[in-house]
Each structure stands twice: as structure tokens, then as C-alpha cells.
Amino acid sequence: MTPTPDAQAARELIRQAVSIPSLSGEEQAIAAFLRDWMARRGFDAQVDEAGNAVGVRGSGPLTVALLGHMDTVPGDIPVRVDEAGVLHGRGSVDAKGSLCTFIAAVSALPPEALSAARFVCIGATEEEAPSSKGARYAMRQHRPDFVLIGEPSGWAGLTLGYKGRLVAKVRVEKDNFHTAGDGTSAADDLTLGWQRVREWAAGFAPADSGGGGIFDRVQVTLQDLGSSGDGLTQRAWATIGLRLPPALAPYQAEEAIEQAFAGLGADLTFTGHESAVRHPKDNALTRALRVAIREQGGTPTFKVKTGTSDMNVVAELWPVPTLAYGPGDSALDHTPEERLDLAEYDRAVAVLTSALTRLVGG
């Protein structure tokens, strides 16, 4: 089936967006492109002080924030649309597909929706970096009544929450000694601490989790590990990544890591303090999306994700109905096979256009 002119314009938007390289910290070209695309279609568009591409349509009393991100991880995937109508390219799924869905849907809203609300599309910078620079700036500039986060959920999926995050950098140094003697090496001590961390994580079970799935458990991984010596001093180091459930705050995880390495002479530093978030599934926003998905022949599916997104970043300052939405399979994020079926993208745009209109009573 040949796409309508509006759908064809939406497809051209995502194809061009994916064609523009935009690593974290290098989003200037994509920001200018999105600003100009939105300005030509009636948005009040600008690139803000954080480098975000921001476009606003509508003049009503409600405010709906649609927060996506423009940056991608590294990886040069030749951009092409294959014979099956699938767009290949870095960012097609994570997460230019979602951001372009937001922009295309808002550009298609009817006058009655635009008189009921302001729709603020934000293409944020540095979501793929620990800074989340764009989201942290945007959350202090806007006070929305509803929030959509642009991350792939599949066109019929609605993501309610993401796990929290903490990164621990561990370093152990001690004087060198003869291995025939009685003692432990720096690597021994670091390994013992790591074993204690794993035991703590495996045993973590909040009373109200009912045994829960992976979303309610602590996940720990070694992201970096090494040791060295110069004949005088032994050194061992590691980076430990933690994914945190809603029942565990980052400061509580810090305390557990410190206890695990107690008495081992370890130097610990922590970064990436993000609390887990899980939003309710029955509110005006989720109801509007569920109805719109059914209109397109789908069955709405609620999800929670073990990763972390800008939903975690904005949750404290934006305590309003929130969910993440966008086309594509998140299993393809950051992979050499990243690709998005444009028919699914079309459907997501249609779903969101209908849902936003219903949400604001248009």
C-alpha cells in the first residue's frame, strides 16, 4: 500500500534524521535539521541552550511533553531502505524512530487538539551519555501535565518503568610481597569484595516483591577488571555496574558495596545515581494510548525495562502520568543489525496522533 502524503513526509523525516550522524556530544547537525523541519510545519522551533531541538505546537491550557533523544551510540551502519520497506541505520530504533514518531504525530494533530493543549517535542542531547544533559536541562524549563518518553516499545507496547543505575569504580593497592609468603594480593582482595557483592545481589529480596521477576532484583556485572604491579606496589581495579529495582535507592546500594569491600583497603567512587521508576498503568495517558492501539488492530502490552532512560532522570521534577512509547524492537538497540520496519513506524505515528487528540479531549 502506497503511504499517504503525510505518511510519506513522516518517512522522509526519519530517513533523513537517521542519515545524519549524531554521536553523544555531536548533535548540532541533527538538532538544526529537526528545528528547521518543525519550523516549516508550524512549530515554534528552536535549539535551546543545552543543544536540544525543541518544537511547540498548540495554545491550550494543558501541556504535553514528548521527550526523545537525538544522540546515538557509535557504529556506522549504512543507511538504506530495503525491498521490504525496512530502514537500516544507527538510531533507527534507539531512538530517532521514537523521536520522529513524536514530531510527525504532533505535526498531524487537528485544530481542536491544538486549541486544547501545548505539545512540546524535545529532541534531547546526550541521553546515551551518563550526563543526560538535554533531559536535565529540559526538565527545569517545562512543567507538563503529561509526559511521553521516546524509547522503543513496539508500536503496541507501553513502557511504564525502568530500573535504576549505579556504577562503582574500585581500586585496591598494596605493597608487593613474595607469593611464597602468607598473604593476599591486591587482585585477591578485589575478587573477594566482588564475590561479596554478588552474594548480596543474589540475596536481595524486598518483602513486598513476592519473589518478583528480574525488574525487582539487583543485577550486577563486571564492566572492567584488571591488575598490574611494578615490583613495589600491586594494583587491582574494577568497574561494577548495578541495575537497581524500585525497592533499592542508589545510596542504599552504595552502602552495600562499601560493606562488601570493608577491610580490604579498597578505594571506591560512585557515579550514575539513578533511581528506578515505575508509573501507574491506569490514567488518562495510558487509557488514550490503549484505545488508539486497539483502533489500529493491536493489543496493548504494558512493559517494564531493565535498562535506564530519561524517564528516570525527569521523574522527580515531573511527577505526572508518564510512559515511554516508540516503534521498534529494543533488542536491536546498539547492535549492527539496528533497523526499523517503516510500516510499524507509520502505525506508531497513527496511534500517537489519535491518542494525543483523545488525551486532550480534542
UniProtKB/Swiss-Prot annotation:
GO molecular function, one term: cobalt ion binding
Residues annotated to bind Zn(2+) 1: H69, D94, E151
Cofactor binding mode and count: Binds 2 Zn(2+) or Co(2+) ions per subunit.
Cofactor(s) demanded: Zn(2+); Co(2+)
GO CC annotation terms, alphabetical: cytoplasm
Active site (catalytic residues): D71, E127
Keywords: Amino-acid biosynthesis, Cobalt, Cytoplasm, Hydrolase, Lysine biosynthesis, Metal-binding, Zinc
GO BP terms, alphabetized: lysine biosynthetic process via aminoadipic acid
Principal location listed in the UniProt entry: cytoplasm
Subcellular location as annotated: Cytoplasm
Catalytic activity: [amino-group carrier protein]-C-terminal-gamma-(L-lysyl)-L-glutamate + H2O = [amino-group carrier protein]-C-terminal-L-glutamate + L-lysine
UniProt-listed InterPro entries: ArgE/DapE_CS (IPR001261), LysK (IPR010175), Peptidase_M20 (IPR002933), Peptidase_M20A (IPR050072)
Function: Catalyzes the release of L-lysine from [LysW]-gamma-L-lysine.
Family: Belongs to the peptidase M20A family. LysK subfamily.
Protein name (database record): [LysW]-lysine hydrolase
Gene name of the encoded protein: lysK
